[in-house]
Amino acid sequence: MNLKGKRITVHDMTLRDGMHPKRHQMTLDQMRAVATGLDAAGVPLIEVTHGDGLGGSSVNYGFPAHTDAEYLGAVIPLLKRAKVSALLLPGIGTVDHLKEAHALGVHTIRVATHCTEADVSEQHIAMARKLDMDTVGFLMMSHMNSPEGLVKQAKLMESYGANCIYITDSAGYMLPDDVKARLGAVRDALQPQTELGFHGHHNLAMGVANSIAAIEAGANRIDGAAAGLGAGAGNTPLEVFVAVCERMGIETGVDVWKIQDVAEDLVVPMMDFPIRLDRDALTLGYAGVYGSFLLFAKRAGDKYGIPARDILVELGRRGMVGGQEDMIEDTALTLAKARAAQAKREAA
């Protein structure tokens, strides 16, 4: 595998996916410090929103410390080189949220749907293109669709106007061969000028390996987070990925030492708990469960006396996807009732 001289765009998730383990409670000062550090390190694209995207503030997804507008307004004026992106999930974020983000100076909008539901993105992608934004179609939980199925969904998003398509391993479930099969098929099907991206999670410790596999399959945009701060066991750790790229001769434009300093000096100290591959995060990857379900499952487990791991396995068995957070407590309650009934039978 010789990728020497290949140039890619690194996209940082610390201030968006990292909102999940922070329970959306990042301060404006934390946002400013990390964003300016990333900018100084040469990261060209930084995502800033509620963990569930524009408009995510709700009972279902969690109330943030500040509004999206406050976060974006705090960060964008400080950046010298980097551009800011925002995530938008149709059904959570609206066209009005999109217009507001554009007015605040957001450069890139990533319209995210489940990997079989690209058709719900048409209105938002079309509006973003009308506003002349860098417009990304973001196919979540991509392990749940075949390469052929992803091709159909990617081509829909491309037809709506997306100039980049992302294959997203939201559960950290995929292995390098899975990544190559899916991204290779999509790359072959898209127009040559349409870019291809990959978003990985580290729930099987495959974030870096999968990202390299994605580049090999034709991806030129890769997501990561400083110190891996993100849902589950975190995103692909950006400082590690940049170092591997440096070793391989892949050109990121990111300073290998400065990105380490951002991770170690700014991001690690603001973690509420270590982002690591514990048994629950590992279960996300093994069972193919949406990464941001982790803290919801832990809370439900504490409430009903059911191990979070058992809840996550059941969510995977049921094929739950992003947007069904309200079903996690229902699943925990169902398991608790079933176990209580079984214990009663055994005692009889």
From Swiss-Prot:
- Keywords per UniProt: Aromatic hydrocarbons catabolism, Lyase, Manganese, Metal-binding
Entry EC no(s) = 4.1.3.39
- What SUPFAM superfamilies does its record include? Aldolase, post-HMGL domain-like
Q: Which InterPro entries match?
A: 2-IPM_HCS-like, 4OH_2_O-val_aldolase, Aldolase_TIM, DmpG_comm, DRE_TIM_HOA, PYR_CT
Catalytic residues at 20
Binding of substrate occurs at 16-17, 170, 199, 290
Gene Ontology terms describing biological process: catabolic process; L-leucine biosynthetic process
Q: Keyword check for NADP, yes or no.
A: no
Record keyword Ligase present = no
Database matches in PANTHER family: 2-ISOPROPYLMALATE SYNTHASE 1, CHLOROPLASTIC-RELATED, HOMOCITRATE SYNTHASE-RELATED
The Swiss-Prot or TrEMBL record describes its family as follows: Belongs to the 4-hydroxy-2-oxovalerate aldolase family.
HAMAP family, alphabetized: HOA
**What protein name does the entry list?**
4-hydroxy-2-oxovalerate aldolase 3
